[in-house]
UniProtKB/Swiss-Prot annotation:
Listed cofactors: [4Fe-4S] cluster
Designated name of the protein: Probable dual-specificity RNA methyltransferase RlmN
Superkingdom in the source lineage: Bacteria
Species: Listeria monocytogenes serovar 1/2a (strain ATCC BAA-679 / EGD-e)
Segments forming domain Radical SAM core: 98-326
HAMAP family from the UniProt entry: RNA_methyltr_RlmN (MF_01849)
Binding site for S-adenosyl-L-methionine: 164-165, 196, 219-221, 297
């Protein structure tokens, strides 16, 4: 039997599992204290947990399914991690130092099928969803990295914006949120957590009905169907009209602000025309709409795209502001490392592929 990650169990899951296996309910409190407060790396270190319980946990669960492969540190404090999963797949995680604390961007899938033409993540198609445990472990590995350097710093914010579409892995992402938000877990405040979606309208409605105060971000990137479909394949399934219907439901249900992410592509979506269209699109909910203008990180494989000029970004920003839309230009992180989402993973897979082809050629030559 393949063991699963202990980090994938919510508080309710762990409590019920322990009781079903003849253990006292309060053991869950002890185990979570060791996992998330003391942050031990083995079950054997849980000194106040009975040997019987330790043996039971060891027989059924593991604590470390991610293996650190590459760590890139930027001069601005951003750190990018490449992890290998137990099946050999690679994923990325990013830690960013902000004025308000330490923020970690997590991956939710191995690859991505959404098909955004400007994104490095979509170059390698989705092979599987991550488990809740694999998502939680990204946070824990970053925290262990900090602990190991005797840095008295704690992950305080989480953005679910890494490789993959979070709402295409909905159940595992929800369990992940329940673990990191729980007061006996990592206790990261709901309002310090943001989940981003490319626009899976039915899941936005589901998310509105969850008992969470977690922030929602929409990867919009275009204000009309023709343009959005040309750069985001998901728009063929969920048009802007369907997306806005779901957003209308979310806003009315939660009365919470939504962030709209808008990547600035030179000559594609950065004209005054698009800025005015965007302002009109968000007008009904302008009091709860917040636009995040994102400078494009060029990706080698996407030679058709360039980042908008600073002048065009500022002009776009000014047009939105003049039309009553709250917006900000995102501060860039890790510009001196593989900053674009999916870029480090893509490069590593290429390197491995080249090495394997060289080995095959060498073996063939020796035969």
């Amino acid at each position: 039997m393949e063991k699963s990650s202990i980090y994938g169990l919510t508080w309710t899951n762990l409590t019920e599992w322990l009781e079903a296996h003849g253990q006292k309910k309060f053991r869950a409190t002890q185990v979570w204290d060791w996992l998330y407060r003391k942050r031990v790396k083995t079950f054997e270190e849980m000194s106040n947990v009975p040997k019987e319980t330790i043996e039971l946990l060891t027989a059924n669960f593991v604590m470390n399914t991610l293996e650190e492969q590459v760590v890139q540190e930027s001069t601005d404090g951003t750190t990018k991690y490449l992890f290998k999963l137990s099946d050999g797949n690679l994923i990325e995680t990013v830690m960013m130092k902000q004025e308000y604390g330490l923020s970690v961007c997590v991956t939710t899938q191995v690859g991505c099928n959404i098909g955004c033409t400007f994104c490095a993540s979509g170059l390698l198609k989705k092979s599987r969803d991550l488990t809740a445990g694999e998502i939680v472990e990204q946070i824990m590995n970053v925290q262990h990295y900090l602990d190991g350097r005797n840095l008295e710093e704690r992950v305080s914010h989480v953005v679910v914006m890494g490789i993959g579409e979070p709402f295409d892995n909905y159940d595992n992402v929800m369990d992940f949120l329940r673990v990191i938000n729980h007061d006996k877990g990592l206790a990261i405040g709901a309002r310090h957590i943001t989940v981003s979606t490319s626009g899976l309208a039915p899941r936005i409605i589901d998310f509105a009905n969850e008992d969470f105060q977690v922030n929602l971000a929409i990867s919009l990137h275009a204000p009309n169907n023709e343009l959005r479909t040309s750069i985001m394949r998901i728009n063929k399934t969920y048009s802007i009209e369907k997306l806005m219907e779901a957003i209308h439901y979310y806003v009315n249900k939660t009365n919470r602000r939504i962030t709209f992410e808008y990547i600035m592509l030179k000559g594609v979506n950065d004209h005054k025309k698009e800025a005015l269209e965007l302002a009109a699109l968000l007008g009904e909910h302008r009091h709860l709409a917040y636009v995040n203008l994102i400078p494009y990180n060029p990706v080698d494989e996407h030679i058709d795209y360039e980042r908008s000029t600073k002048e065009d970004v500022l002009a776009f920003y000014d047009t939105l502001k003049k039309n009553g839309i709250n917006c900000v230009i995102r501060r860039e992180h890790g510009t001196d490392i593989d900053a674009a989402c999916g870029q480090l993973r893509s490069k590593q897979i290429k390197r491995v592929g080249v090495r394997e082809r060289m080995k095959q050629k060498q073996a063939a030559a020796e035969e």
